[in-house]
């Protein structure tokens, strides 16, 4: 459903009215990686529907608005903002601009922001951060989003592999994985 709808909206030139910034990013994408990123998110959603699993509209919206977010965040960084401030302001800006084209319910906005914010936190492998991430109510959606980002060459596969392993191992192994690496003294 999601994939077919996306293609139909593009085919009949309607997508640009619903997601103008994303449409512009798709047109300007020189890497050729954004369209497959969006398509994979749609296909994943279709798979979840077929398997009678829950679907989060916020996940799809987060995917569609990701490139506009990263462009604005990069611009904000170049203006001298801290990474956190650049990201937060970009989130607010992208959501505000998208709201001019389509209304996004507040409950979705919160979920979208959480999915985006967790992306930065996935890089922290030490201490309690991985445990807190695993317990976060948006972990699964953010983790699935992270996997999509590997295909856009934004994230190294080793990070996803580490997080996958961390979820699957016992508590003792998790503790070992989150301990600082000891340097050999000679």
Report the location of each language-model feature.
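Conserved, hydrophobic alpha-helical core segments of structured domains
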Residues: 1-177
């Amino acid at each position: 459903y999601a994939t077919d709808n996306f293609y139909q909206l593009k085919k009949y030139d309607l997508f640009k009215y619903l997601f103008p910034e994303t449409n512009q990013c798709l047109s300007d994408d020189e890497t050729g990686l954004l369209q497959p990123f969006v398509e994979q998110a749609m296909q994943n959603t279709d798979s979840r529907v077929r398997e009678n699993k829950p679907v989060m509209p916020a996940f799809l919206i987060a995917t569609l608005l990701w490139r506009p977010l990263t462009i604005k965040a990069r611009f904000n960084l170049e203006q001298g903002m801290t990474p956190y401030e650049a990201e937060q302001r970009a989130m607010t800006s992208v959501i505000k601009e998208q709201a001019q084209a389509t209304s996004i319910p507040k409950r979705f906005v919160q979920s979208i922001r959480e999915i985006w914010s967790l992306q930065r936190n996935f890089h922290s492998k030490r201490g309690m951060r991985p445990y807190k991430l695993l317990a976060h109510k948006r972990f699964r959606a953010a983790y699935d989003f992270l996997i999509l980002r590997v295909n856009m060459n934004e994230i190294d596969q080793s990070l996803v592999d580490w997080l996958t392993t961390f979820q699957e191992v016992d508590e003792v192994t998790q503790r070992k994985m989150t301990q600082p690496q000891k340097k050999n003294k000679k």
